[in-house]
């Protein structure tokens, strides 16, 4: 799918809203409660977009977003923590033209 397709089919606005919500949900790697919050948020987004909530598992004390075999055609491999300590990034979310800046915008 090209960026033109994203705009053409009306997906750009909800995609950007989801990305912004994930970025604004600060989740430093070592803050397990904050990581749980971002995993719950990702599950809420998945439920809205795909109609299927993720199972949230705890593996070695860390929250994991898991679909299992419910959507075998989808592979999502990512990290959801924004890594940086709370308040490290200012502004947390910034859009200038077609450039978005913030923790995790490239790989969330």
Residues of each region from the PLM?
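DPxDG-like acidic metal-binding loop motif
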Residues: 108
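Acidic/His- and Gly-rich active-site-bordering loop/insert found
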Residues: 2-104
């Amino acid at each position: 799918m090209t960026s033109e397709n994203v705009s053409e089919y009306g997906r750009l606005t909800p995609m950007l809203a989801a990305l912004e919500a994930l970025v604004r949900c600060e989740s430093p790697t070592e803050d397990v409660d904050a990581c749980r919050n971002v995993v719950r948020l990702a599950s809420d987004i998945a439920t809205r977009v795909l109609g299927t909530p993720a199972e949230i598992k705890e593996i070695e004390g860390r929250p994991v977003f898991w679909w299992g075999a419910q959507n075998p055609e989808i592979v999502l491999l990512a990290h959801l923590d924004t890594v940086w300590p709370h308040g490290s990034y200012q502004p947390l979310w910034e859009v200038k033209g077609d450039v978005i800046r913030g923790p995790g915008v490239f790989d969330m």
